[in-house]
Amino acid sequence: MVEIVVVKLIYRIMENNMNDTELAGVNENLPRRQIVLDKLNEWGIPFTMYEHPPLPTIEMALEYWKDVEATHCKNLFFRNHKGNKHYLVVFECHQQMAIHDIEKMLHQGKLSFASEQRMDKYLGLKPGSVSPFGLINDTNKEVKLFLDKNLKDAPLLSFHPNDNRASLVVKNEDFMRYLELWGGEWEFLELY
């Protein structure tokens, strides 16, 4: 409870220096973040949360992550050619993956990045805040998660809590427990 209050107080302080568009983004994302925090607390999954300015890209985030000990992840949301299947692909943030290489690895046919509308529909997220925590919103378990197998060996993992103004660090074993409790389809794959 204290952590939640602190988050709200920090945002009230930040609001004094923001324009209306920035304020709308903060107010819109706080409930998304709160859903994640509530679910992790409900499931007994410990985490450390780091707050920072909005970081919609990896390049911007690296400056703020430099002192955060964790494997920071890149999260890409795809759809198949027909648009009837959706995939979240997660790998270490410093790796580069071409979409054609990902298509070959996943064996799911031709892929394209999912639209903002699909991202909202299936993950309840906006661009720049995609993470496996968005799977909490996939109540019908329609998104398949692919994790690079190298993440198996990372002691700590870092993801946005459905809000790119913060990063959550969780122990690998706690993240695996999160995936089990989520209950959707996921697998490790050698992506690079």
Regions found by a protein language model. Give the residues of each.
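Acidic, Ala/Val/Gly-enriched low-complexity intrinsically disordered segments
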Residues: 2-7
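Extended, low-hydrophobicity, polar/charged segments
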Residues: 9-192
